């Protein structure tokens, strides 16, 4: 037999290690602790002591069964004392057995019945109870008989007896023996009718939802061909397999990321609500048009204020939001500072306006910004009402305006179209009532409704940092009601609404749908076009705002994946595009029309070219803004982009393609749509110089005295001569000098002399653009 540790022996006999150590000490065997080992001799002595104790416990049980008086404590005395071992007085212990308390009567027999295996040793004893008792005394006193005559010696064997079943710890021992009886398995709970989960569940989580043991689910999964552990995540298919086996329905919950305000905003805006809670809301109207055609004067006449007089040059300096009340109905007007801000809002996905009023001067007709406004409104998908202004002037010709607008698919109702035309005089107030009636008519057709009983959502019209009040934002509530004290997230900022001021400069406590209001209380300045959402508590708003701010900091407002000719074929293959948006700028109107007509004929695999804007002149920043909002490609024919436009295109990742031959532009776009573009040389603009003075020298030609305004001019670079935004010549530099010395390059801020090969028609204020060709490979 191998050595056994104390704690192992105690565990095997279901007693504490302390009692085993005490029993070994009674046998004269010293052990240090529960980790000590018991050798074979000591183990044999300990087993004999245990066997003897078990026999002592069994003897009272046998006598109890034959005792008619039911006195179960009679034979217990031989186990309690070992000093009195006379064989001629077998009945004396029985007489002394009546002294102990009767509380141990039922506990004395229980341990004996719990150790049936130990009773097998009694077959070797004699047939009488006295002989059995004598055997017990001999077994228990043999290891330590020398200690039987000292004081307190009677308790020594009794301590050994306590090691098994007797004494004051019998109750505790009884509890230990009771725990060995296998408990009745609990009745399993009824299966639920349906469980709801999002994304995935672990085996343990699914077992908890089904009120089943994880091991049961693991077995079922194994039988279904899925090997999984208790902490392994299960996909939707595995969850459905298990639940189908149990007959439980499964529902997947789609969680909306509240930090993604755009998605959350759309879900909240399109949330199904009780029709009885919806009320009619005022329409939001944007006034657009060419410079000095009377946009602000119109709004001024409607509000009976003199806003125009306080503005420099009659140009609106900030975004104004005003609300008017006509015939007991309200209309919200937005006055935009040009179309850039409007386009920027649309580029961020903020569809805040319902109706567009296009102001056209009757004496001026359709102008370039008028066309831009039409393209913006059409791209946003808004209904257009044309206000023909300045009809009071003698040279006014409204019919000419209508005729010109038909070219842009704005056909008057009087001519069989669906566009409302309203002749007005903003200065004298003529026709304004009719215009307002038309606005209310269109809004009634659109069925504009909102729920004022919900938490507010909307968009930012403008924002600024005020020295006295801190971050200030002008908001347009699109749905719900905004109250003072509401926790709010605005774009990447957050806070609590501290104060609200309406368009009349009065403090208000709450505002409803389609109402503009200026608020304070944000931690930072948001951007125009940002969404705002009111949340239930400030803690949630703070967490969402901080999360969005940290994400924005990491992303650094990374540019979206704009469409370019390089990746056009990939977008088409992925099925992301049904049409290619193109903006065309050229030197003359004839080139614009020819190029647009040729591009419209291109059709590759059902994808065609859509011309969203055409104009004559250099590519400007407004073109880039429109291209960024519409995900369009800009094509320039015999024109160049301005420095601001080039910088904006780089920031917005807008693709600009410049050509001097029409068929090359057409071939390039068609090849891109077919995915057949080969590696090519890319042009890199390295600098620009302005011609300050020209000197004609015989045998040399015209020397241009230039000042480098951007980048640098190098001796081996190609150059273009640009006059009024139009390329007049393209060639190479013949000489580049500085202070009569040849120079390899001249940097920004320095003057130089330049002659161009085969070109002497250089004039003052011309721009010399230097470029180099770099070989690139299409991605």
From Swiss-Prot:
Region (G2): 314-318
Annotated segments matching region G4: 389-392
Function text: One of the essential components for the initiation of protein synthesis. Protects formylmethionyl-tRNA from spontaneous hydrolysis and promotes its binding to the 30S ribosomal subunits. Also involved in the hydrolysis of GTP during the formation of the 70S ribosomal complex.
Family membership: Belongs to the TRAFAC class translation factor GTPase superfamily. Classic translation factor GTPase family. IF-2 subfamily.
Region of interest called G3, as start-end residue ranges on this chain: 335-338
Biased composition (Polar residues): 66-81
Keywords, sorted A to Z: Cytoplasm, GTP-binding, Initiation factor, Nucleotide-binding, Protein biosynthesis
Single annotated GO MF: GTPase activity
GO CC aspect terms: cytoplasm; cytosol
Comp. bias (Low complexity): 82-93, 117-167
Taxonomic superkingdom: Bacteria
Protein name in the entry: Translation initiation factor IF-2
Residue span(s) of domain tr-type G: 280-449
């Amino acid at each position: 037999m191998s050595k056994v540790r104390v704690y192992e022996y105690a565990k095997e006999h279901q007693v504490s290690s302390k009692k085993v150590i005490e029993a070994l000490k009674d046998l004269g065997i010293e052990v240090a602790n529960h980790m000590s080992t018991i050798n074979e001799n000591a183990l044999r002595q300990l087993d004999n002591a245990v066997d003897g104790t078990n026999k002592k416990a069994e003897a009272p049980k046998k006598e109890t069964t034959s005792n008619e008086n039911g006195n179960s404590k009679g034979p217990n005395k031989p186990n309690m004392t070992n000093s009195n071992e006379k064989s001629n007085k077998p009945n004396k212990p029985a007489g002394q057995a009546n002294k102990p308390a009767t509380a141990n009567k039922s506990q004395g027999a229980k341990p004996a019945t719990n150790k049936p295996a130990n009773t097998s040793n009694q077959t070797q004893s004699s047939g009488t109870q006295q002989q059995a008792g004598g055997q017990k005394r001999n077994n228990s006193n043999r290891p330590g008989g020398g200690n039987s005559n000292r004081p307190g010696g009677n308790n020594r064997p009794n301590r050994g007896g306590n090691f098994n079943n007797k004494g004051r710890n019998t109750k505790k021992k009884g509890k230990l023996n009771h725990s060995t009886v296998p408990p009745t398995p609990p009745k399993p709970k009824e299966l639920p009718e349906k469980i709801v989960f999002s994304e995935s569940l672990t085996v343990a989580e699914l077992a908890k939802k089904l009120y089943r043991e994880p091991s049961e689910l693991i077995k079922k999964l194994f039988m279904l061909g899925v090997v999984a552990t208790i902490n392994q995540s299960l996909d939707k298919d595995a969850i459905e397999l298990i639940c189908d086996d149990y007959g439980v329905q499964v529902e997947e919950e789609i969680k909306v990321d509240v930090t993604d305000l755009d998605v959350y905003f759309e879900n909240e805006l399109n949330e199904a609500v009780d029709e009885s809670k919806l009320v009619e809301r005022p329409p939001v109207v944007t006034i657009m048009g060419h410079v000095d055609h009377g946009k602000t004067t119109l709004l001024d006449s409607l509000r009976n204020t003199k806003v125009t007089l306080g503005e420099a040059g009659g140009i609106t300096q900030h975004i104004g939001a005003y609300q008017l009340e006509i015939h007991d109905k309200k209309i919200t007007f937005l006055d935009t500072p040009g179309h850039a801000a409007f386009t920027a809002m649309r580029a961020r996905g903020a569809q805040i306006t319902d109706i567009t009023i296009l102001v056209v001067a009757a004496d001026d007709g359709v102008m370039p910004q008028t066309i831009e406004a039409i393209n913006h409104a059409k791209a946003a998908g808004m209904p257009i009402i044309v206000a023909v202004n300045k009809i009071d002037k003698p040279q006014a010709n409204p019919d000419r305006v209508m005729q010109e607008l038909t070219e842009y698919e704005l056909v008057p109702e009087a001519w069989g179209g669906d566009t409302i035309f309203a002749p007005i005089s903003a200065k004298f107030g003529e026709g304004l009532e009719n215009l307002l009636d038309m606005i209310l008519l269109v809004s009634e057709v659109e069925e504009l409704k909102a729920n004022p009983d919900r938490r507010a959502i909307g968009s930012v019209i403008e924002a600024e940092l005020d020295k006295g009040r801190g971050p200030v934002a002008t908001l347009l509530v699109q749905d719900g009601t905004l109250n003072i004290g509401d926790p709010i997230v605005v774009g990447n900022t957050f806070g609590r609404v501290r104060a609200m001021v309406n368009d009349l400069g009065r403090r208000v406590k709450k505002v409803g749908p389609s109402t503009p209001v200026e608020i304070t209380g944000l931690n930072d300045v948001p951007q125009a076009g940002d969404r705002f959402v009111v949340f239930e508590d400030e803690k949630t708003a703070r967490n969402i705002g901080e999360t969005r701010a940290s994400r924005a900091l990491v992303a650094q407002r990374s540019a979206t994946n704009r469409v370019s000719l390089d990746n056009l074929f990939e977008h088409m293959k992925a099925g992301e595009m049904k049409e290619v948006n193109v903006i065309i700028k050229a030197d003359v109107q004839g080139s614009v029309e020819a190029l647009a007509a040729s591009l419209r004929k291109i059709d590759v695999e059902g994808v065609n070219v859509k011309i969203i804007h055409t104009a004559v002149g250099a590519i400007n920043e407004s073109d880039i803004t429109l291209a960024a909002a519409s995900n369009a490609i800009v094509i320039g024919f015999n024109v160049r982009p301005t420095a601001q436009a080039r910088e904006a295109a780089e920031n917005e990742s807008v693709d600009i393609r410049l050509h001097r031959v029409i068929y090359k532009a057409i071939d390039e776009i068609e090849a891109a749509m077919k995915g057949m573009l080969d590696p090519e040389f890319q042009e890199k603009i390295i600098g620009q110089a302005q011609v300050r003075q020209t000197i004609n020298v015989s045998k040399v030609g015209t020397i241009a005295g230039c000042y480098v305004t951007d980048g640098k001019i190098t001796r081996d670079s190609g150059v273009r001569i640009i006059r009024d935004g139009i390329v007049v010549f393209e060639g190479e530099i013949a000489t580049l000098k500085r202070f009569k010395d040849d120079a390899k390059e001249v940097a920004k801020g320095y003057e130089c002399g330049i002659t161009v090969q085969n070109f002497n028609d250089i004039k003052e204020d011309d721009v010399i653009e230097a470029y180099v060709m770099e070989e690139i490979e299409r991605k």
